Amino acid sequence: MGLLSVDLLITLQILPVFFSNCLFLALYDSVILLKHVALLLSRSKSTRGEWRRMLTSEGLRCVWNSFLLDAYKQVKLGEDAPNSSVVHVSNPEAGNNCASEKTADGAECHLLDFASAERPLVVNFGSATUPPFTRQLPAFRQLVEEFSSVADFLLVYIDEAHPSDGWAVPGDSSMSFEVKKHRNQEDRCAAAHQLLERFSLPPQCQVVADRMDNNANVAYGVAFERVCIVQRRKIAYLGGKGPFSYNLQEVRSWLEKNFSKRUILD
């Protein structure tokens, strides 16, 4: 099959889910607009914030690109895990136990540097401006605390899902982040630190940031968020595309299935 035929087939596969996502965004905007109007009529102080639509040209472009990223991802279940280039981000809760010899912020390393021969590596991809990702960080922290005796954990900070100067989401809670598009590696590491200041992670969890060429994001088809498990340098578990198929409960089930309760409690 020629390259053009493959591209056409992928486009046809993407179109139904793309349009369903557009419908979701339209419904979301309608609900938020009705809520905003109701607050205006009640003269509530909560209406001081600016109302932002999600169904915009920028939003459509981001959603479409996310499906393309997922469709062309290198990572496959049961196959070799891509050894993407990343940079170290110091975890305030962690000691100096990075797999790389250099542990200063911005020190180059690779994703599989954090994988050991015998223990699975749970890799969690996301950014501060992705609400589904940040909402699940307490659950991810719980996983680290419960399973760190039998598994290793790595958080990979990627390109912002909803930068404040791009496809921004309404800042309707105290847990929302205002982060602009990363202009350089320092910006990305700073955004990761901002996330860690709000959501502390156990010292057993290492933190890295994707390079500015987004090579980890592309290889793993992350787009917004994704989680996977690497075991013996192979993909033992590959989570679905975020936000709707991002599921940490499946990670818990995998760990519980592969390790006895006795091992976890040791």
Curated annotation (Swiss-Prot):
Q: How is it modified after translation?
A: Ubiquitinated by MARCHF6, leading to its degradation by the proteasome. Deubiquitinated by USP20 and USP33.
Catalytic class of the enzyme: oxidoreductase
Q: What does this protein do?
A: Plays a crucial role in the metabolism of thyroid hormones (TH) and has specific roles in TH activation and inactivation by deiodination. Catalyzes the deiodination of L-thyroxine (T4) to 3,5,3'-triiodothyronine (T3) and 3',5'-diiodothyronine (3',5'-T2) to 3'-monoiodothyronine (3'-T1) via outer-ring deiodination (ORD). Catalyzes the deiodination of 3,3',5'-triiodothyronine (rT3) to 3,3'-diiodothyronine (3,3'-T2) via ORD. Catalyzes the phenolic ring deiodinations of 3,3',5'-triiodothyronamine and 3',5'- diiodothyronamine.
A GO CC term attached to the entry: endoplasmic reticulum membrane
Q: Which residues cross the membrane?
A: 10-34
Q: Can you say where in the cell this protein is located?
A: Endoplasmic reticulum membrane
Q: What keyword terms does UniProt attach to this protein?
A: Endoplasmic reticulum, Membrane, Oxidoreductase, Selenocysteine, Thyroid hormones biosynthesis, Transmembrane, Transmembrane helix, Ubl conjugation
Give the GO molecular function terms: thyroxine 5'-deiodinase activity; thyroxine 5-deiodinase activity; ubiquitin protein ligase binding
Which organism is the protein's source? Answer: Rattus norvegicus (Rat)
Family, according to the entry, reads as follows: Belongs to the iodothyronine deiodinase family.
What name does the UniProt record give this protein? Type II iodothyronine deiodinase
Cytoplasmic-facing ranges: 35-266
Which SUPFAM superfamilies does the entry mention?
Answer: Thioredoxin-like
What reactions does this protein catalyze?
Answer: 3,3',5-triiodo-L-thyronine + iodide + A + H(+) = L-thyroxine + AH2; 3,3'-diiodo-L-thyronine + iodide + A + H(+) = 3,3',5'-triiodo-L-thyronine + AH2; 3'-iodo-L-thyronine + iodide + A + H(+) = 3',5'-diiodo-L-thyronine + AH2; 3,3'-diiodothyronamine + iodide + A + H(+) = 3,3',5'-triiodothyronamine + AH2
